[in-house]
C-alpha cells in the first residue's frame, strides 16, 4: 500500500468483509458464534476507519 487511493481500496475491502460477517451472524442461531462474528465485524470496521484516516492524512500532505 502506498497512496491514499490504495488505502481507500483497503478500507472498502474491509468494510465489505464486515458487511458479510454481519450478514452471516444474522443467520446463526448459537449466540456465542453470532456474537463472535459481530465482534469480528466491529474489528474490521475499526481497521477500515484507520485506513481511511491514513488516506486522509496522505491527501493533506500532498
What are these regions, as identified by a protein language model?
Residues 1-62:
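Long, non-catalytic architectural segments outside compact domain cores
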